[in-house]
Amino acid sequence: MMHTRQLFQCFIVMVFGWATFAHAEPKLLEPEQAFQVKVRQRHNDNVTAHFTIADNYYLYRDRMRIAVKDTPGVVIQSVHFPAGIMKQDPNFGRMEIYKNAVAVNIVLKRPAGTQKVTLVIDYQGCEEKTGVCYPPMQKALMLTLKD
């Protein structure tokens, strides 16, 4: 009788332990870990915003915006987003996304002598396995330009 009770208790522990393990969701990264962005000057007025995207995460191309902030006379002439991957998104329908990394090229127009520029970058992304999407994020990055 005692042996049967112990077997039954072990069975219950195994069933509930397995159920908890099977339903455990992966831990989500903080947004700053999932989506890292840096800017650097490539040449004269050409700047690159480089995104490093964690494994199993992606960024929406259409949710990316780049603007100049608090830098008089400096404007963005053009922004070039490379081609991404098309994804059927459960929340937004057919969307272009980036995985792993993406480099966005930015051409500035600035007066002579302008040394510092602040770029404000808006973006949004999701974790692929759970389908959890982060709220839109914004990052302001200052860059010292060389002539």
Give the location of each predicted region.
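N-terminal secretory signal peptides that target proteins for export/translocation
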Residues: 1-4
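Intrinsic disorder/low-complexity segments enriched in polar/small residues
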Residues: 7-10, 116
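Extracellular/lumen-exposed scaffold segments
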Residues: 21-147
